[in-house]
Amino acid sequence: MSQRELCNSVDGKVSPTAIAKYEKGLMMPSSDVLIVLSNALNMKLDYFFRPYTIDIDPSKFEFRKKSNLGSKKVESIKHLVCSEIEKYLEIEAILGITSKFCLDYSNTTVEGENEAKLLALRLRNDLNIGSDAIVSAIDLLETVGVKIIEIDHDSSFSGTCNEAVGLPVIVVNKNMCSERKRLTIFHELGHLLMHCADGVDKEKMCNVFANEVLIPSDKFKNLIGESRHDISLVELQAIQREYGISVDALMVNRAFASEVISYSKAAALLDMSVNEVRDTLNLM
């Protein structure tokens, strides 16, 4: 949100010039102005009185293009996340906890789904988990220096990522179900790790990467068998319990990609029309 947009959101009660002076510390807002600004930004009043000690660039937060977040919500989330990250890192500093992030895949360029899957398998190998189910995505990634912050927000926000003091930070909505939260964490990790070639849809590659991290394609085929032309909901639910993957478009997409089910079967499992399934699968 620009200074002028913020000014407009408070019906001109604060001028862009005044906002600029507040930001530079040249002038202090009155209590009435603080209340107006906190309401406009959806932030608590104490946010404005906390000095930042951690260098975080809010402009580097990325949000999914198809999300329903308006500019006001985006700015509110950015500032909330910066505050939460700062508190998180301050606590670690007090406790003497140090972290180092060692995963570097900058020498790999993702040009399509195959490379995204290979990168996911490389990550699994580097984390020494083979093809096993991931018990806790948060615990696993925090052991290699990834900071994961959960914030309280409505369903319009799922996740985002950034860097702070040289460490990757992933932010997720604490109110999501565990399966969606796990998928979002690895989707955002894809944004942090993956370098995509020009013209490649990074959002789609991050989905492919996240799916493959959660359950490798070969493992999925081993679980359901190589030659199948159908799959039951009971089987999908068993895989859900073991691998923490929701029985929705993710699992159906994996089964469809493995040529286990047809569009019509996917539609039946998802309670959608065939055309809706086509659209859903094309987005993943």
Residue ranges of each PLM-predicted region?
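Short juxta-domain linker segments that transition from a proline/glycine-rich
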Residues: 1-284
